UniProtKB/Swiss-Prot annotation:
The gene is glmU. GO terms for biological process: cell morphogenesis; cell wall organization; lipid A biosynthetic process; peptidoglycan biosynthetic process; regulation of cell shape; UDP-N-acetylglucosamine biosynthetic process. Its EC number is 2.7.7.23, 2.3.1.157. This is Bifunctional protein GlmU. Homotrimer. Binds 1 Mg(2+) ion per subunit. It is an enzyme of class 2 (transferase). It comes from Wolbachia pipientis wMel.
Length: 430
């Protein structure tokens, strides 16, 4: 009987020299999130008992901000076998029957559904591995005999040099008892002085244990070793996201020009126009329209709102139902009420704008005094004339009007007209 509890062991040590970067490989981003965040995010979809990440010392400080994971330090980077051995020694209290999923931090596109399939296939087996078909002959290979996995070898060690083969995706699933016993039997490779996790397949077979395998698509199994691999993975990620959204009822007018983050949420009947970028933390409710060349991050766009073109929204901003945020408008750390219009050339920062208000073209909320940021509150049914500067901290109460061209430095009472500009002087030219 397969255990219902499982633990993820994610291998993330090693810098990744082929990336040619000061940043550790697993922290390079796809869809605005690091590779490691992708792996952790997908693991959490399965509600595991524990997520353990094996890292080397240089990486551990960078990962302390990660929540709900256990960091295990691999003192010396002696290969994947040593990494899993180190993890299992740190997880000694894990029940023998608990399922352990071993995954690489640089293989970020593996779906939780694929892991579920591997877990379900574990019944009656000591170990289940993941393979995929590819024309790239550099991958390690799964050697299959009579329907059973016999060993995993490097491409150069494939004696038969098969034209068609299953490549090794690197993901393994086993019960804790078997994994503990098998990794302890891995011997150090005499030429590289490392311990290879893939050796446990042949070790299991020699112990008369059954080893199974599951096949997935090559795009999902993409491993990342260099910048070109990163480009491919980003492409596959975006293509998959576009399909997910269109299948769920979102209209993408030109899908190939729209870019998403891992956590982007868009409800059905929304329309996304060309050249829109979604950063982290964006949620779009049903019926909203995002017009071309808009850049959104950390914001909520409510039902039937319209944003863009050429709009930037960020900083935990909420745009209310049926509100319109127009061209060349930036809204940051603000709340915009239902049916409010901010249509042209404006900056709204650290502000709350009520319902049914109109913010005229060229309005600037001056929220920063050089040291600190201050709040501005604009009530409902207000009209702010064009080219107005609102100097925070400031309160403009309901149903008030700000005359065009004003510089407002004092609070404006309810149902009031505020004018703050020089009187026009007109003289005849001689």
């Amino acid at each position: 009987m397969i255990s219902k509890t499982h633990t993820f062991v994610i291998l993330a040590s090693g810098h990744g020299r082929r990336m040619n970067s000061d940043l550790p490989k697993v922290l390079h981003k796809i869809g605005s999130f690091s590779m490691l965040q992708h792996v952790i995010y997908n693991a959490k979809q399965l509600n595991p008992e524990n997520i353990a990440v094996v890292v080397d010392q240089p990486l551990i400080e960078r990962l302390k901000c990660f929540k709900d994971i256990q960091l295990i330090t691999q003192e010396l980077t002696l290969g994947t076998g040593d990494a899993v051995k180190t993890a299992m020694r740190n997880l000694r209290e894990l029940p023998d029957s608990s399922i352990v999923v071993v995954q690489y931090g640089d293989t970020p596109l593996i779906k939780s559904s694929t892991i579920t399939k591997m877990i379900s296939y574990l019944e009656g087996k000591a170990l289940v591995c993941l393979g995929f078909r590819t024309s790239n002959k550099e991958y390690g290979r799964l050697i299959i005999e009579n329907g059973s996995l016999r060993e995993i070898v490097e491409a150069k060690s494939d004696k038969n040099n098969h034209e068609e083969f299953l490549a090794n995706a690197g993901i393994m699933v086993a019960c804790a008892k078997n994994l503990r016993e098998l990794v302890e039997k891995i011997e150090c490779n005499s030429s590289t002085h490392e311990y290879y996790l893939t050796d446990i397949v042949s070790i299991a077979v020699k112990s008369n244990l059954n080893v199974g395998y599951v096949i997935t698509g090559g795009e999902e199994a993409t491993g990342i070793n260099n910048r070109n691999d990163l480009i491919k993975a980003e492409f596959y990620f975006q293509e998959n996201k576009r399909k997910i959204f269109t299948d769920s009822g979102v209209t993408l007018v030109a899908p190939e020009t729209v870019f998403f983050s891992l956590d982007t949420q868009i409800a059905r009947d929304s329309v996304i126009y060309p050249y829109v970028f979604f950063g982290t933390g964006v949620k779009i409710e049903s019926g909203a329209k995002i017009l071309p060349f808009s850049h959104l991050e950390n914001c909520l766009i409510k039902s039937n709102a319209e944003v863009g073109p050429f709009t930037r929204i960020r900083g935990n901003t909420t745009i209310g139902n049926k509100a319109k945020i127009g061209n060349f408008v930036e809204v940051k750390t603000s709340e915009v009420g239902q049916n409010t219009r901010i249509k042209h050339l404006s900056y709204i920062g650290n502000a709350k704008v009520g319902q049914e208000s109109n913010i005229g073209a060229g309005t600037i909320v001056c929220n920063y005094d050089g040291k600190n940021k201050h709040e501005t509150n604009i009530g409902s049914n207000c009209f702010v004339g064009a080219n107005s500067s609102l100097i925070a901290p400031l309160n403009i109460h309901d149903e008030s009007v700000i005359a065009a061209g004003s510089v407002i430095v004092e609070d404006v009472p309810e149902k009031s007209l505020a004018i703050a500009r020089e009187k026009q002087v007109t003289k005849r030219i001689k």
